[in-house]
């Protein structure tokens, strides 16, 4: 490598942002139009954006290299893990209102999963379940620690069932005023949590999901492990700084969250939906980081006598990444506006969108991370050159958390039929652009037919149409046009589009707020 080449790389590394919020101006713009008290929130976003880059992100690489270790009942982490965790909980993220929680989670995900995003999502779901379904006594005892330092987790999956929770066999037996849980859980993310939410079947309960109860299991009783042991920690492709294990319960003391017969409704409607929503927020934040890494590198890297950002294919790649990450944020904020809504139409829309959006954004995150790696070339595959390999691995795990793609689209198909909500869903994307409306008219008839082979593609096209409409509404005209042409217009061919180069240049140069100091 020449001295000039090494100097360019050093200047790129020195130019990296020191605050995740300051390089996400579109987040602030979007929140400003959705929150009346945004002025109160913005200083906290500035402060947390700095914490993410300066405290949390530097710790992740070491955490992944060393990784969590476990014995029968304890999980051990490097010291930096606890320090980063305290900084995350100090932000107030676990009990914040939806838009505030989403904004903080988006900034946290600048560092990928980072060992703390999944714990936050699980804790936020438990907080919401306690607030909405637990007895006052249970809420008073277990909620306050979750808002300040304690971590929650949710253990639903069993080896024989996977996403088929109705096949679960872990048992719950009443013991006076409490219950005892016995059985094994197969995917236990946040194995170090202070409070476990465990699904189990009460004795005599009916088969399937109707017989599933939802229980809170404290990790410790009087300082001693509460009837559980960790079989092992999983050796995962991604999210390696966070402990995921197999845990066996043997007579663990448990408290019901809500009535036992409502367990699956609470697990799916509160815990899983919270995680799916925040998974999408995390995917959007991860995409933002991937785009910034690629755009920053391309602005410094020179090849064949010019900066690589000036090559048409690199510019196209960056423009596509930017359109995807902006679209993902807006569709996820659309979900955020529906969280906790009691309006029947909004609740029906939320049932559909929280699943469809998780499916769409997690797929997009993997593709954007891969495009970013392509921009860096061979350097993009080196673990200690940039965070991109880690982000890519995390994104693949995000795809598979809280239901595979096929599980999610199947749920959407069932809900559209059960709640007769197709018109409500389509209407949310209408009235912005005739080309989007035409695509929705075509989709209406196709989405009425729930063909298991083709419905997933139809759902994906709907999500792309919705995201395009949201980009237009947000005033992101160039990004909306690019998204429309790539995903919504039938038979569009870039080579036949005389406006395509100008559109790419507009998308690329639009981001004047993010400066890389040359």
Go through each PLM region and give its residues.
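Internal helix-loop-helix
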Residues: 63-149, 189-191, 385, 401, ...
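C-terminal helix-coil-helix/basic helical segment that borders enzyme active sites and/or dimer interfaces
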Residues: 326-358, 373-376, 448-453
């Amino acid at each position: 490598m020449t001295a000039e080449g090494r100097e360019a790389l050093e200047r790129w590394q020195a130019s990296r942002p020191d605050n995740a919020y300051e390089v996400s101006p579109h987040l602030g713009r979007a929140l400003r139009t959705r929150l009346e008290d945004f002025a109160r929130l913005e200083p906290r976003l500035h402060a947390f954006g700095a914490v993410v880059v300066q405290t949390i992100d530097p710790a992740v690489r070491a955490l992944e290299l060393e990784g969590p270790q476990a014995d029968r009942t304890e999980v051990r982490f490097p010291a930096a893990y606890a320090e980063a965790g305290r900084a995350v909980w100090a932000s107030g993220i676990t009990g914040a209102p939806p838009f505030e929680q989403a904004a903080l989670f988006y900034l946290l995900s600048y560092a990928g999963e980072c060992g703390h995003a999944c714990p936050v999502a699980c804790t936020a779901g438990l907080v919401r379940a306690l607030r909405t379904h637990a007895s006052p006594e249970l809420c008073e005892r277990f909620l306050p620690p979750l808002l300040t330092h304690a971590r929650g987790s949710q253990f639903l999956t069993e080896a024989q069932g996977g996403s088929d929770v109705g096949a679960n066999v872990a048992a719950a037996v009443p013991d006076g005023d409490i219950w005892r849980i016995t059985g094994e859980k197969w995917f236990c993310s946040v194995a170090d949590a202070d409070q476990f939410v465990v699904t189990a079947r009460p004795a005599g309960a009916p088969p399937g999901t109707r017989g599933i109860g939802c229980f809170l299991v404290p990790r410790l009783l009087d300082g001693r492990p509460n009837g559980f042991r960790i079989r092992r920690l999983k050796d995962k492709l991604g999210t390696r700084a966070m402990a995921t294990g197999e845990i066996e319960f043997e007579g663990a003391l448990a408290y019901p969250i809500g009535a036992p017969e409502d367990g699956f409704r609470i697990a799916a409607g509160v815990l899983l939906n919270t995680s799916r929503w925040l998974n999408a927020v995390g995917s959007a934040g991860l995409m933002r980081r991937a785009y910034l890494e690629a755009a920053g590198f391309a602005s410094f890297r020179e090849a064949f006598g010019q900066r690589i950002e000036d090559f048409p294919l690199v510019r196209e790649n960056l423009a596509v990444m930017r359109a995807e990450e902006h679209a993902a944020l807006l569709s996820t904020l659309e979900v955020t506006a529906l969280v906790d809504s009691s309006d029947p139409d909004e609740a029906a829309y939320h049932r559909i969108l929280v699943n469809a959006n998780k499916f769409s954004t997690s797929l997009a995150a993997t593709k954007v991370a891969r495009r970013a790696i392509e921009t860096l070339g061979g350097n993009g595959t080196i673990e200690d050159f940039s965070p991109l390999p880690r982000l890519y691995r995390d994104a693949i795990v995000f795809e598979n958390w809280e239901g595979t793609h096929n599980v999610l689209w199947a749920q959407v198909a069932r809900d559209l039929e059960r709640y007769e909500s197709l018109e409500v869903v389509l209407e949310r994307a209408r009235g912005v652009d005739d080309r989007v409306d035409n695509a929705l008219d075509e989709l209406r008839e196709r989405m009425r037919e729930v063909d298991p082979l083709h419905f997933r593609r139809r759902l994906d096209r709907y999500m792309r149409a919705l995201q395009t409409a949201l980009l237009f509404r947000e005033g992101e005209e160039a990004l909306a046009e690019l998204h429309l042409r790539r995903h919504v217009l039938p038979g569009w061919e870039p080579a036949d589009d005389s406006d395509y180069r100008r559109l790419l240049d507009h998308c690329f140069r639009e981001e004047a707020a993010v400066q890389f100091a040359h």
